[in-house]
C-alpha cells in the first residue's frame, strides 16, 4: 500500500517541479523576446514566431511530465509486481 502512496507523492512532486521549471523557462524566453523587440522593432514578426515555437517546446516538457505523473498514478506497469514484492499479492 505504501508503494501507491509513494507513487502519488512522486507524481505530485514531479508535476510541481516540471511546472516550476517550465514557468521559469517561459518567463526567461518572453523576457528575451521582449528585449529583442525593444532593441529592433522591425524584427518583431520573426522574434514573435520564434518565441511562440520555443514556448510550445517548453510547454511540451510540462505535458510530458503530466503524462508520466498520470502513468505513475493510474497505469503503473509494475504495480502487480510490486504488490507481490511487498507481500500484498496473492
Swiss-Prot record:
Transmembrane segments: 4-24, 53-73
Protein location: Cell inner membrane
Lineage, top ranks: Bacteria, Pseudomonadati, Thermodesulfobacteriota, Syntrophobacteria, Syntrophobacterales
GO molecular function: lipid binding; proton-transporting ATP synthase activity, rotational mechanism
Subunit structure: F-type ATPases have 2 components, F(1) - the catalytic core - and F(0) - the membrane proton channel. F(1) has five subunits: alpha(3), beta(3), gamma(1), delta(1), epsilon(1). F(0) has three main subunits: a(1), b(2) and c(10-14). The alpha and beta chains form an alternating ring which encloses part of the gamma chain. F(1) is attached to F(0) by a central stalk formed by the gamma and epsilon chains, while a peripheral stalk is formed by the delta and b chains.
The name this protein goes by in its record: ATP synthase subunit c
Keywords of the record: ATP synthesis, Cell inner membrane, Cell membrane, CF(0), Hydrogen ion transport, Ion transport, Lipid-binding, Membrane, Transmembrane, Transmembrane helix, Transport
Homology family: Belongs to the ATPase C chain family.
One Pfam family hit: ATP-synt_C
PROSITE patterns in the cross-refs: ATPASE_C
One cellular component (GO) term of this entry: proton-transporting two-sector ATPase complex, proton-transporting domain
Job of this protein: F(1)F(0) ATP synthase produces ATP from ADP in the presence of a proton or sodium gradient. F-type ATPases consist of two structural domains, F(1) containing the extramembraneous catalytic core and F(0) containing the membrane proton channel, linked together by a central stalk and a peripheral stalk. During catalysis, ATP synthesis in the catalytic domain of F(1) is coupled via a rotary mechanism of the central stalk subunits to proton translocation. Key component of the F(0) channel; it plays a direct role in translocation across the membrane. A homomeric c-ring of between 10-14 subunits forms the central stalk rotor element with the F(1) delta and epsilon subunits.
Coiled-coil ranges from the UniProt annotation: none
Membrane topology: Multi-pass membrane protein
Site (Reversibly protonated during proton transport): 59
